[in-house]
């Protein structure tokens, strides 16, 4: 027999961002607890609001299965001494099964007598086992925790009640000074407490008390109400998923409403308005049918429609106060030229151990000018880069960014545009922060992409030079994200940048031109280059490349992300082709022969030492590949050459007795292997 089991932890209001993760954690830990205690169940449903974390275990077994099994122990000669007395090994074996040594008997197995016990144990009742759920509560972890009253225990918020019902029966789980019962709390202002008769009454009983405990249902209500409101006014809305999730976890009974503000505030940049509404007030911004921001917002109340006009008025007043501040900052900042803010960069610290923002901008210009030549930017683009690299951090000391830090770069773009800077310069100020998240949008302009790469590369070089290198578990300055951003931009722009070559050259360029400490020596340069290169794996994984393809291309000595990606594309594309297996096997055979022969000093191949036409054919084939740059073309050439390679092995003894012939043939194979290594370490490919 089975019954449903309800377990609710009632708390003070939790921060919205922890609710979903916390209820998932509760479900995972509860499921683990039940499995470890031998209780089967169909599934675990989760319910959550800011005031409760709940699991409903469907079809939970009433008891553990009875145990009736034979356990094998040590051999008889170990279980008993010469006088027939039980040894410690025997006593320990029996005790481990909940038995005594007197319960041991012996049976022969393959000519050897072993100790056995027959274990028979009645399974425990589910109600008895569930009393141990206090351990689940104790095991839960949170980003921040609180203590309350005189308790020494910490939880995400103080716990005020517990509900534990197995079917209709209370399971009196005890935690601190609380004993679980069948009484739960309705909405803080609209509902009353509820006495649950049965675990399955939970959802509907709380609905009657203005609590929608199903987070998915609550979210659907919000979306439906928003759509009704938007359609009735002929508006448009960008339904931000993360904001919707946050708002959903702020309410127990959602009611959507719209508010408005004076049109004069539309004169400030859209991003300021959106930040004020979305980030500060948790409002959804509203657009007209042409996609233009209008002076309205949508929000969600934790309650019903009673006195909704007062709620709307209160929210409008709060937003207007915020917007008045924004207008003041905007007007104050525009009183000064950009040079006024740039002059203050000397007093803005990038990092105590590295130097000022002014010094950083100087380094970034040097790096960017070097990269611009490699990337082939036009003279106009280089001029725009030189201009923007001398001012791009200026908005950090504006009043607007001082109040709205999330607008750094954005306000710089707007202020630069107002000051008459061209579009390339203005937009690059915003784009140099991109991508702002691991998979965020990339710069759309060449100048912005160059500035972003140069700025991120400088940051990584500076922190490595100062000895602040990320560990496997700690990256406080997000250097891995910066490195991944560099890789994504390079690949998006199809810019070639072999890190092993570029890093030492940049460090040399910066030497003597900055007070910041730089990486010292080839070993530190390599460590830094490898750190950035390692982010290519993240890119390939994100783009669903097969694990063996990733292993193969990253095992090569290639440092240029564009070349590594090109190789990965070819191997991925042809991985399941009929020709792939024989080609890879032939090339891998060559690599293995060279490795076994410990052959590393290849000499130019001497055709005069050839003894068979197959050697000349392979020589001609390799010569034809010497100038092939495209990886796809290289692979196709290997497919065409595969028969030649096989004939070469069929006819020729590689390890010939004649030393000159042997070395010549190994040199031939080394020439093939050098070309194959452009595709990666093919031995790591899994071929069938």
Curated annotation (Swiss-Prot):
A single Pfam family it belongs to is: tRNA_synt_2f
User: The organism sits in which domain of life?
Assistant: Bacteria
Tell me which InterPro entries the record gives.
Answer: Gly-tRNA-synth_bsu, Gly-tRNA-synth_heterodimer
Q: Which GO terms describe its biological process?
A: glycyl-tRNA aminoacylation
Q: What is its EC number?
A: 6.1.1.14
Alphabetical keyword list: Aminoacyl-tRNA synthetase, ATP-binding, Cytoplasm, Ligase, Nucleotide-binding, Protein biosynthesis
Q: Its principal location?
A: cytoplasm
Q: Which reaction does it catalyse?
A: tRNA(Gly) + glycine + ATP = glycyl-tRNA(Gly) + AMP + diphosphate
Q: Where in the cell is it found?
A: Cytoplasm
Recorded family membership: Belongs to the class-II aminoacyl-tRNA synthetase family.
| NCBIfam families in the record | glyS
State the PANTHER family in the record.
GLYCINE--TRNA LIGASE, CHLOROPLASTIC_MITOCHONDRIAL 2 (PTHR30075:SF2), GLYCYL-TRNA SYNTHETASE (PTHR30075)
- What's this protein's name? Glycine--tRNA ligase beta subunit
What is the scientific name of the source organism?
A: Lactobacillus delbrueckii subsp. bulgaricus (strain ATCC BAA-365 / Lb-18)
Taxonomy, top ranks, is:
Bacteria, Bacillati, Bacillota, Bacilli, Lactobacillales
Gene that produces this protein: glyS
